[in-house]
């Protein structure tokens, strides 16, 4: 055999770009054809090899001694003999020829191996799932388990380090499989779940099959406690998004949310924003964690995790870290002992472990009640809007973050025809480049001026349609008053006279063209503008006569007879 064996057009770990693969006595390597980072694997780390049909021809799957899998796809059928000699002579490993099941059945047996989960149909593999591709698993029903896959890793060529350690596969396409569910009824033992002989140990306890599958997968895929030592744990923390109560386990590189139904494992690298927001009730604080990629629960995505803490809840906590780590890796980031309000402790630990800045509301804005949160709603969902230094933040659901840099303009408006139109208003935030808009409704009118001043302070374009509408309405009302003031004055007041007076007395001195108001007819002391002294004397005499007539009528008017049964 030659000192080096080369193969062209080979794909590493489902990568989109092909490359050249070279085998030598001390190991193997792969380099992309277009240039880039090369992958190498030492011969001492090769624990086994399998040959099978794959997407681009034939595939060599290399099982690593350090719990991992390397896939090389794109070989031709005639390469089998050549590769078999390479693995046998140089790596002392047999290249096992494995045939996949092509029956298309969706029922079979799951087998946990060292590096991957295999679904077998009639003792042949239908598909395999490397543990490194599994990001999370949850019990989705009574006999059902959901297995979630790792998302796009940001376009890296492969997830392996130079020594072939555990890592994600090549960057995925725009559309990719994100979840698979297994229905596992009945009971079983741990040995059966791992592919052992049933009944080999009489003392082996039977458990629910789906629960045992779940526990085994968590252990194999290193999800949860097996991912490392817990630095801190917070129990029964209320989460508004996703809704429920979760225990928070914080590790060196990730944290875990453990609930009754769902568990989430989140890398600190996925944290893009971290905010501490006081609720307007002065009793609670909200901790908002922005994630990219977002948290996924079935078909629902959660770009923000929103926790709620009581403002007066104190905690005493000692971190599970050594003095050496505290003075080295976490110097000036963490303390060994905390005795403070719970929300502050959680925020400090997240800041130290994730190395993220903690964002709080801007000091330049408060509501008319001297609060930072504005009560409002997005469509039918009520919540609170916070003005940060560089963005808006609406919580709890749907949690919405809008950067000032992406804001084109802001419009203040009032809902026409609404009963509360005079006491509330709406804010519409228009995004740049036609990215749409977001509307925040039912904001207290007393916060209008403070918001307008804050937006102008931040250099945002503001259009106040409320003032424009008010001016137009005032102008329209002013014209109507000028045009109909006389009619409105005479109309309703002319009917206030006495019926007896209308029938029995005629005002002979009334002039239709007179400008005097009807009030003059009843007010003896009223002086009509523009009338002479003679007209005043006449009016006074008429008033005196009317009074005398009223007195006479009062004396002559008989009493009403009482009805008798």
Swiss-Prot record:
It is found in: Nucleus; Chromosome. GO terms for molecular function: DNA binding; histone binding; nucleosome binding. Transmembrane segments: none annotated. Residues 152-165 have a biased composition (Gly residues). Signal peptide: none annotated. GO terms for biological process: DNA repair; DNA replication-dependent chromatin assembly; DNA-templated DNA replication; nucleosome organization; pericentric heterochromatin formation; positive regulation of RNA polymerase II transcription preinitiation complex assembly; silent mating-type cassette heterochromatin formation; subtelomeric heterochromatin formation. Residues 478-489, 500-522, 532-553 have a biased composition (Acidic residues). GO terms for cellular component: chromosome, telomeric region; FACT complex. Keywords: Chromosome, DNA damage, DNA repair, DNA replication, Nucleus, Transcription, Transcription regulation. It comes from the Eukaryota. Its main location: nucleus. It holds the Pfam family SSrecog. The keyword Repeat does not apply. In contrast to the orthologous protein in animals and plants, this protein does not contain a HMG box DNA-binding domain. This function may instead be provided by the HMG box of the associated nhp-1 protein in the FACT complex of fungi. Component of the FACT complex, a general chromatin factor that acts to reorganize nucleosomes. The FACT complex is involved in multiple processes that require DNA as a template such as mRNA elongation, DNA replication and DNA repair. During transcription elongation the FACT complex acts as a histone chaperone that both destabilizes and restores nucleosomal structure. Forms a stable heterodimer with ctc-2/spt16. The dimer of ctc-1 and ctc-2 weakly associates with multiple molecules of nhp-1/nhp6 to form the FACT complex. Belongs to the SSRP1 family. This is FACT complex subunit ctc-1. It comes from Neurospora crassa (strain ATCC 24698 / 74-OR23-1A / CBS 708.71 / DSM 1257 / FGSC 987).
